[in-house]
Amino acid sequence: NRLCCSQYGFCGTTSEYCSRVSGCQS
């Protein structure tokens, strides 16, 4: 599974973290 973190430091594997959040890193 792929963990993505937003620019605010919140991490998750859903599209909310991986796609809809700007400035996220995989």
Swiss-Prot record:
GO terms for biological process: defense response to fungus; killing of cells of another organism. InterPro entries: Chitin-bd_1 (IPR001002), Endochitinase-like_sf (IPR036861). GO terms for molecular function: chitin binding. Has potential use as a flocculating agent in water treatment processes. Disulfide bonds join C4-C18. Keywords: Antimicrobial, Chitin-binding, Disulfide bond, Fungicide. Transmembrane segments: none annotated. Residues 1-26 form the Chitin-binding type-1 domain. This is Morintide mO4. It comes from Moringa oleifera (Horseradish tree). The lineage of its organism: Eukaryota, Viridiplantae, Streptophyta, Embryophyta, Tracheophyta.
